[in-house]
Amino acid sequence: MKAVVLTLAVLFLTGSQARHFWQRDEPRSSWDKIKDFATVYVDTVKDSGREYVAQFEASAFGKQLNLKLLDNWDSLSSTVSKLQEQLGPVTQEFWDNLEKETEGLREEMNKDLQEVRQKVQPYLDEFQKKWQEEVERYRQKVEPLGAELRESARQKLTELQEKLSPLAEELRDSARTHVDTLRTKLAPYSNELQQRLAARLESIKEGGGASLAEYQAKAREHLSVLSEKARPALEDLRQGLLPVLESFKASVQNVLDEATKKLNTQ
């Protein structure tokens, strides 16, 4: 639990925010991404699980056992869905509290990202401009060759390919040159961002020991509240599973009894 909140803040913020920093689109909330991923994962598990149960019951061994798991699966899925609905507000409250507690740290990280972005932006614009110029120059060189191809396609195909090959290599080499130049220019700013992040974490560890302990205590408190509020919903899930387990035990016992009778009569 040491630095749980710091790990969440740094991981989610520097990961998601940095990606949008390069793409220039509106960042989605890290908490929303986690909730969406959890929902998709649970739905996938339910769908794939139902498929496996159906395949098992369709097999010869499944027909012999006659466990009727598929009938109980829908009931179980309904119970799980009910559990999700009951836990929804609880988990939302947990993430809201955690997001609120790390707001100050996230704001500082965003400031650092914005400062570096402003410094780097001219180099990105320059790279984009040069790349567009290279593509336009390549297009102008290729266009006459395309006309040649249309005039005498079959006879000139080999010759055209030979002419295009060095042009493509030239474009590729130019792109590599521009990328290397951009990488060289951006390296100091990347190092600066890393140093700022390291300094920020170090200052929290050394000068903000109380804040770190406070983050840890609040995170534990939120987890404890989440556990207490989730307990009734988990109990409902357990009660919903009992009929499925009892049906399974009864079916297996019947199969064993029939097998024992057959062995005794032989």
Swiss-Prot record:
<dbReference type="InterPro" id="IPR050163">
    <property type="entry name" value="Apolipoprotein_A1/A4/E"/>
</dbReference>
<feature type="repeat" description="6">
    <location>
        <begin position="166"/>
        <end position="187"/>
    </location>
</feature>
<dbReference type="Pfam" id="PF01442">
    <property type="entry name" value="Apolipoprotein"/>
</dbReference>
<dbReference type="GO" id="GO:0060228">
    <property type="term" value="F:phosphatidylcholine-sterol O-acyltransferase activator activity"/>
</dbReference>
<protein>
    <recommendedName>
        <fullName>Apolipoprotein A-I</fullName>
    </recommendedName>
</protein>
<feature type="signal peptide">
    <location>
        <begin position="1"/>
        <end position="18"/>
    </location>
</feature>
<dbReference type="GO" id="GO:0055090">
    <property type="term" value="P:acylglycerol homeostasis"/>
</dbReference>
<keyword id="KW-0558">Oxidation</keyword>
<dbReference type="GO" id="GO:0042277">
    <property type="term" value="F:peptide binding"/>
</dbReference>
<dbReference type="GO" id="GO:1903561">
    <property type="term" value="C:extracellular vesicle"/>
</dbReference>
<dbReference type="GO" id="GO:0034364">
    <property type="term" value="C:high-density lipoprotein particle"/>
</dbReference>
<keyword id="KW-0753">Steroid metabolism</keyword>
<dbReference type="GO" id="GO:0018158">
    <property type="term" value="P:protein oxidation"/>
</dbReference>
<feature type="repeat" description="2">
    <location>
        <begin position="89"/>
        <end position="110"/>
    </location>
</feature>
<keyword id="KW-0445">Lipid transport</keyword>
<feature type="repeat" description="7">
    <location>
        <begin position="188"/>
        <end position="209"/>
    </location>
</feature>
<feature type="repeat" description="4">
    <location>
        <begin position="122"/>
        <end position="143"/>
    </location>
</feature>
<keyword id="KW-0345">HDL</keyword>
<dbReference type="InterPro" id="IPR000074">
    <property type="entry name" value="ApoA_E"/>
</dbReference>
<dbReference type="GO" id="GO:0042627">
    <property type="term" value="C:chylomicron"/>
</dbReference>
<keyword id="KW-0153">Cholesterol metabolism</keyword>
<feature type="modified residue" description="Methionine sulfoxide">
    <location>
        <position position="109"/>
    </location>
</feature>
<dbReference type="GO" id="GO:1902995">
    <property type="term" value="P:positive regulation of phospholipid efflux"/>
</dbReference>
<comment type="function">
    <text>Participates in the reverse transport of cholesterol from tissues to the liver for excretion by promoting cholesterol efflux from tissues and by acting as a cofactor for the lecithin cholesterol acyltransferase (LCAT). As part of the SPAP complex, activates spermatozoa motility.</text>
</comment>
<dbReference type="GO" id="GO:0050821">
    <property type="term" value="P:protein stabilization"/>
</dbReference>
<feature type="repeat" description="1">
    <location>
        <begin position="67"/>
        <end position="88"/>
    </location>
</feature>
<keyword id="KW-0325">Glycoprotein</keyword>
<keyword id="KW-0677">Repeat</keyword>
<feature type="repeat" description="5">
    <location>
        <begin position="144"/>
        <end position="165"/>
    </location>
</feature>
<dbReference type="GO" id="GO:0005543">
    <property type="term" value="F:phospholipid binding"/>
</dbReference>
<dbReference type="GO" id="GO:0120020">
    <property type="term" value="F:cholesterol transfer activity"/>
</dbReference>
<dbReference type="GO" id="GO:0008203">
    <property type="term" value="P:cholesterol metabolic process"/>
</dbReference>
<comment type="subunit">
    <text>Homodimer. Interacts with APOA1BP and CLU. Component of a sperm activating protein complex (SPAP), consisting of APOA1, an immunoglobulin heavy chain, an immunoglobulin light chain and albumin. Interacts with NDRG1. Interacts with SCGB3A2. Interacts with NAXE and YJEFN3.</text>
</comment>
<dbReference type="GO" id="GO:0042803">
    <property type="term" value="F:protein homodimerization activity"/>
</dbReference>
<feature type="repeat" description="10">
    <location>
        <begin position="243"/>
        <end position="266"/>
    </location>
</feature>
<dbReference type="GO" id="GO:0033344">
    <property type="term" value="P:cholesterol efflux"/>
</dbReference>
<comment type="similarity">
    <text>Belongs to the apolipoprotein A1/A4/E family.</text>
</comment>
<dbReference type="GO" id="GO:0050766">
    <property type="term" value="P:positive regulation of phagocytosis"/>
</dbReference>
<dbReference type="GO" id="GO:0001540">
    <property type="term" value="F:amyloid-beta binding"/>
</dbReference>
<dbReference type="GO" id="GO:0010875">
    <property type="term" value="P:positive regulation of cholesterol efflux"/>
</dbReference>
<keyword id="KW-0964">Secreted</keyword>
<feature type="repeat" description="3; half-length">
    <location>
        <begin position="111"/>
        <end position="121"/>
    </location>
</feature>
